[in-house]
């Protein structure tokens, strides 16, 4: 009977949340996808242009780069939007390709940035002075008439400029290298590495811009793409998560058996759920700590509701009015990445 009650509660919760989401606060995955694609493309292009033109501090470049690490979430949203929106379904292949190309471009740019950091740390100023003029030529390619790239037309224009610039790059690099070979003790290996990374990055960026521009049309040749993004789980991380969960369950199970606590079954079940949720977080320990503190806050809130508010209300409407503010706080916290653990526990 208890199991049937829980199933009924879950079903009612899903139906209620679905009705409210569809009728009261309609937010469609397809629209969110389009907004995310536009925002991410514009932000990344501006970031690259500012970084390569020297407008960003090197430490600030590293901080901004971490904001673009939402590849898995984007792929999950694309998979859901395919069933909801016919326009997204027609562009599904290009969206998957866009995600993969963005991952390649951002990774390549990060590698180039790390190489330049190493050259700065090693004091290889000659190699830096030789390659940086090429960097400063890229920012104008990512604008149209001096304005930032935003629309598909702007992206197509930038893709054409990047392609032409990339095709001319090997010849120019060879000419520069021929001049540098005459200089004794010049770090040619560092220059060659930077030039190769730059060429590969421009190739990835041009592909990314071309795919973004192709989204303006319902059908496009770039839709026919065989590769797919396949997330892979780190075996070491999975093993550690399994050991951590087993240790917690065994410890709490021993405590339950030794104390004969009537609520021990709920303790073990909640611990297993907490370990499962925490294992998917980048920092499982911090997430578990947040969920623990959120649970403590929820207990205090529960005492307040049970003994302070419930005796003074009568009827379903007043019950909703009493619960809504506290539930809203938990939902708000769960939407903030830094507070998600607290909100999820509440």
From Swiss-Prot:
The gene is fusC. It comes from the Bacteria. Keywords: Cell membrane, Membrane, Transmembrane, Transmembrane helix, Transport. Involved in the resistance (detoxification) of the fungal toxin fusaric acid. GO terms for cellular component: plasma membrane. GO terms for molecular function: transmembrane transporter activity. Its main location: membrane. The lineage of its organism: Bacteria, Pseudomonadati, Pseudomonadota, Betaproteobacteria, Burkholderiales. InterPro entries: PHBA_efflux_AaeB/fusaric-R (IPR006726). It is found in: Cell membrane. Coiled coil: none annotated. The keyword tRNA-binding does not apply. It comes from Burkholderia cepacia (Pseudomonas cepacia). It is a multi-pass membrane protein. The chain crosses the membrane at residues 10-30, 248-268, 291-311, 315-335. Belongs to the aromatic acid exporter ArAE (TC 2.A.85) family. This is Fusaric acid resistance protein FusC.
